[in-house]
Amino acid sequence: MKHTQRFRIPDDWKCHTYNHVYFGLVELTIKLSQLLEFQDNKMIEIGSYMGESTHIFGSCGLFTEINCIEPFSGTENFNDKNNHTWEEVWEEYDINTRQFKDIVKLHEDYSYDEKVLSKFNDDEYDFVY
């Protein structure tokens, strides 16, 4: 089994006896549950990679729409170090987001691309990650 950035972190990332990367995001969702005031929250996730964070954001139930911006291409040190291909990354993304197809919208491009940026209005989203 290969390492991932959230669910199965590399040994050299470990600084505790538990997965602090996973728990850090869970703690963030707890804070968000206290801060977000609306029922119909929308978010943008820049760099969804394998969809592990997307899975956690979908599972927490705070968002009715999660917009993922991920090109699934280019240079990624984590891919090189852990022998991942972009095809494998996309397959993991698809697996990790499969339960949230009704709220997850994938924008398969770079976050700085004008055609992606033009899809989002500043005042329409409650959280950007």
For the regions a language model picked out, list residue spans one by one.
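A short alpha-helical cap/connector motif
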Residues: 1-129
